[in-house]
Amino acid sequence: MSRMRMGKVMAGVLAAALGAGAAVVEPKNTDEILTNPGMGICHFYYSSRIWAYGAASEPGDTLDWMPGTSVIYMRLPWCYLEPEEGVFRWDILDSKARPWIAAGKKIAFRISCMDPTLCSIPDWAIRAGIRGSESHYRDNPKNALIFEPVWDDPVLIEKVTNFYRAFAARYDGNPDVAFVDLGSFGLYGEGHAPKLRRIREEDPAEYDRLCHLHLDLLRKALPRTYLVVSEDIAGGGWIETDASAIGTTPNPFTPGGKPRLYDHPILAYARSIGYGLRDDSIMCNAQRPWASDHFGRLFARETPVVIESGHLSKRLQTKSWRPELLRKCIEEYHASYISTHGFPEIYWKTNKDVWSDFANRLGYRFELRRVEYPDTVKVSEKVSVKSTWVNVGVAPQYANASLTWNLLNEKGVVCWSVTDPKFGFRSLPPKLEDGEKPVEVVSPCTFGYTAPVPNNGNDAILNWCIQNNQDDPGKTVALLKPGVYTLAVSVGRNDGKPEIALPLEGGVGRVYPVGRISVVE
């Protein structure tokens, strides 16, 4: 990094002496919409349809023009991916995922066994003996016939398990996968269907057993993957109960009405085996735009929450879409992801005026408010860098990223890197109703390393260097040369690799300059 560029970066920074050899910097945070792991806006490329909502997109378009879009989400019926038993069309997924992965973004999936527009279970699997029945969607003879299986049919469980095994061989523990939804149970994977509704009403214990069966199937198949389940599997957040019941919460859209269940046994079980929550979907009802925010807050204590908007075209048609509510919904769910359920151009056009308003509250967002450090240090001297951080997002950073302080030379090359051995960003509380919670971090740092060169005559390489007067290290070796460096901050892995974008100016490769520091012998 050139001196001129560094000067421009530091122009908006307050720096003052704090006694001899100490400096304080108060960086100016920007309002840039960031793209970060473990959070962000999800593009609905396949929405239970092979053609919507991404088929019209240009190849390679990763929607950088929709800032904060970090995930391509693909929800497809099983029949597309296994048209013959044991013959898989992974190329339908991988061809669309490749550009996103190359751009440093993530992928997410839901593979369903029941959808309203076609038979989602492959024909060969039904011929193998899966029991079930056909009915017209929503009992309308004009709608397509759809097949609802017997949800614990042994052949269904066998074939789904085999598919999961093949799917897991490619995607379980894959670092490019953000999450996988449960899709094998109910219409869309949401736990409801004509016969399932009757079972839930007439025999709740049997319905719970079926839920557990399918939750366990996916969990067993993908033990190293973040799994997500729709809140509809528990009936959604609309369930009301008596005010005297234990464990209730108010209903914000029906003041004075019955309160909602605070938790649900099925969701509690899902949490116990590591599932996160997804709301399918918000703003489908003009009077009650959402109902499961209380479930979202429960899950958000430990896992990222996903909210999904209703199909935008339908919401615009019914006049239930209210862009100004996106931020409020994110705040009430403590959401980390939001899925844009519609054609991206229409979604952007409809919501661009509120985009930064909601995107900069989604998930986590780390602001560096203050840095105090010695402006001159000796090589190998133990010093401290004191920094103050605020998470102005609505959710924690669940992966617990690490804090690293770097020294850059005039070319912007990292010459030294020290990662705080204790502090993790999971401990940084999000900004909720009770306001910001700044956290001061004192990072122990040692810049450089000097050591004597052992010379007992047995080192043939050292002897050659001395005899040929070439690359002779002398009596000591210093791994960091004295000089003036740029102190820079980064957030990421505990080995120092930067991964998290910060709202700071002048960053290159997610390493951000803070100030100048001199290293002396």
Predicted feature residues:
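Active-site groove signature of glycoside hydrolases
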Residues: 135-156, 161-201
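Substrate-binding cleft/loops of secretory-pathway carbohydrate-active enzymes
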Residues: 184-217, 221, 228-299
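Bacterial N-terminal signal peptides that target proteins for export
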Residues: 1-10
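N-terminal substrate-binding region of glycoside hydrolase catalytic domains
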Residues: 24-156, 295-331, 335-349
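Extracellular/luminal regions of secreted and cell-surface proteins that mediate adhesion/ECM remodeling
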Residues: 359-521
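Conserved, mostly hydrophobic/aromatic
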Residues: 72, 100, 167, 180, ...
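Hydrophobic core
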Residues: 14, 18-19
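Substrate-binding cleft of secreted/luminal carbohydrate-active enzymes
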Residues: 248-372
